[in-house]
C-alpha cells in the first residue's frame, strides 16, 4: 500500500489494454489489396488446407487474413474488406475477410448464417 506522499509524487497509472487487432487502428473494418492468396495448414490436432490471403491495408500495414466459407473468387490485386477476428488454429492470422463486400463474392448455396457470408436470399 503506497503512502499519501508516494501517491502525490507518482500517482496511479491506468492499466493500458492491448488491442487484439492493431492493424485496424481502432476502425471496425479496413480496405486492402490482396498481395498473395494461398492455403496453409492448421496447428497440431487439426488437419486441413485453410484459405488465407496476405493483404496490404490502406495504412500500408500488411496482414494475413482468413477467407471464410466454401470457395472464393479472390486473387492477387483483389480489393477486400478486412475485419478483426482471429482463427484459433492458424498462428498469426488475426483478421478475416468480409464476404460479399467489394471484390469478394458471397458464398454460393448458403442457407443458414447467410449475412456472415454475404449470401443473398435464394428465390423460390
UniProtKB/Swiss-Prot annotation:
PROSITE patterns: RIBOSOMAL_S12. Keywords: Methylation, Ribonucleoprotein, Ribosomal protein, RNA-binding, rRNA-binding, tRNA-binding. The modification 3-methylthioaspartic acid is found at residue 89. GO terms for biological process: translation. GO terms for molecular function: rRNA binding; structural constituent of ribosome; tRNA binding. The keyword Transmembrane helix does not apply. Residues 9-18 have a biased composition (Basic residues). Residues 1-28 are annotated as: Disordered. Transmembrane segments: none annotated. This is Small ribosomal subunit protein uS12. GO terms for cellular component: small ribosomal subunit. Belongs to the universal ribosomal protein uS12 family. Part of the 30S ribosomal subunit. Contacts proteins S8 and S17. May interact with IF1 in the 30S initiation complex. With S4 and S5 plays an important role in translational accuracy.
Amino acid at each position: 500500500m503506497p503512502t499519501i506522499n508516494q501517491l502525490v509524487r507518482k500517482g496511479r497509472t491506468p492499466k493500458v489494454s492491448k488491442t487484439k487487432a492493431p492493424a485496424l487502428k481502432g476502425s471496425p473494418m479496413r480496405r486492402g489489396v490482396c498481395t498473395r492468396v494461398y492455403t496453409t495448414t492448421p496447428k497440431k490436432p487439426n488437419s486441413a488446407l485453410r484459405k488465407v490471403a496476405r493483404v496490404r491495408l490502406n495504412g500500408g500495414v500488411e496482414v494475413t487474413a482468413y477467407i471464410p466459407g466454401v470457395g472464393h473468387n479472390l486473387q492477387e490485386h483483389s480489393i477486400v474488406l478486412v475485419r478483426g477476428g482471429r482463427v484459433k488454429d492458424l498462428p498469426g492470422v488475426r483478421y478475416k475477410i468480409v464476404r460479399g463486400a467489394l471484390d469478394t463474392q458471397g458464398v454460393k448455396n448458403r442457407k443458414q448464417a447467410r449475412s456472415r457470408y454475404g449470401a443473398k436470399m435464394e428465390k423460390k
